[in-house]
Amino acid sequence: MARYRTTISVLIVTAALFIGACDRTNQFPELKKTWGQQELLIGLIPEQDVFRQREHYMVLKKYLYDRLGITVNFTNLSRYGNIVERFTAENMDGGFFDSFTYALAHNQLGVEALVRPVNLDGTSTYRGYIFVRKDSGIRTAAEMKGKRFAFVERATTAGYLFPLAYLRENGITDPPAYLGGTFFAGSPEAVIQAVLNKEADIGAAKNTIYDLLAAENPRVEKELVILTSSSVLPLNCLALRRDLDPELKSALKKTLLDMEKDRNGTETLRRFGARGFIETDNRDYEYLYRLSAQVGIDLKTYRYKNE
C-alpha cells in the first residue's frame, strides 16, 4: 500500500510539472522556437554607480534567460555621448536609452522603441530639474550670470537640452558667454554631487536620480533647491535595431509586458525596481523633438560629443 501511494504521488507530481510546462508554452508560444543560441548585446547609459546599475539589470537578464532561453549581455557605456559609435562598432542589438539617446539612435541608426518601465510609484515618465544650492542666492535665470553650470552630457535631455531651452526662453541665447563656465559631469548623480560640493553653482539632472539621491542623502533636500522642471518625458526605453528578427522582438516585448502576471516576474520586477513595463514608441517623444527644434538641434546631424 505504501508503495502504491508513493507511485501515485510521483505520477501526480510528474503530471503537475508537465501541465505547468504546457501552460508555460501556451502562455509564451514563442518558446516553441529554439532561442537557445541567441545572444543579445544591450547597452546601458550611465546614470548611477556602474556596479549598482549592473546589479540592477542582472535580475532581468536571468528572467529573460529562464523564460525564453535568450542570453542577454548588458554593457555599461562610459558616457552618453559615445552610444551611437559603440552601438555600431560593437554590433549592439539594442539599448536601454534615455529620451535623448533614443532620439539620436532612432534618427541616426533607425532603432525602434519597444517598452519602457513603470516605476514603483506608477509613473513611467520623468522630468528635468534645474537646481542650485540654497545658499547660492540664485533663484532666476538672470541671477545665473557669471555662475558655473554643470551639465550631464551634450546627449541628454534633462542634463543639457532642457536647460538650454530654459536659458533661451529667458533670453540667454549664448550660454557660454553669459555663464561663468560650464562642464559636463558625465552622469546625473555626478552633477548633483558637483552642486552639493560647490564645484558648480547650478546643475541639471532628471528627477528620478535626484529624488533617489534625496532619499539616500539628507544633504540633497537640506542644501539644494529646485528652480524649475520640464514637462514629462518617457523613462529609459528598451529600443532594438530595426533588422532584428521580428519574432524575437515580439517574444521579448510580450515577455516584458507580461512580467507582472507571474510570480517570478513580479519578484524580478521588485528587485529591478519597477512595477512593470508598458509599450512605447516614437510618438511618445514629441516634447523632446519640440525642445530640439527650439534650440536648433538637428538630431540626424547633431554633434553630440562633449567639447
PLM-predicted stretches and their roles:
Residues E112-G122, Y178-G181, A214-V232:
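Short beta-strand->loop
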Residues M1-S9:
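Bacterial N-terminal signal peptides that target proteins for export
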Residues F18-A21:
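C-terminal motif of bacterial Sec signal peptides marking the signal peptidase cleavage site
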Residues G81-G95, Q108-L109, A142-E143, S187-T208:
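Short helices/loops that flank or line small-molecule/ion binding pockets
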Residues Y126-I130, P234-L240:
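Small-molecule pocket liners
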Residues D23-R24, K33-G43, Q48-V59, A239-E307:
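An extracytoplasmic/periplasmic, membrane-proximal ligand-sensing/linker region
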Residues F96-Q108, P163, R168-E169, A194-N197, ...:
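A ligand-binding cleft/hinge motif common to bilobed small-molecule-binding domains
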Residues Q37, I42-Y65, L77, F100, ...:
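Bilobed "Venus flytrap"/periplasmic-binding protein-like clamshell domains
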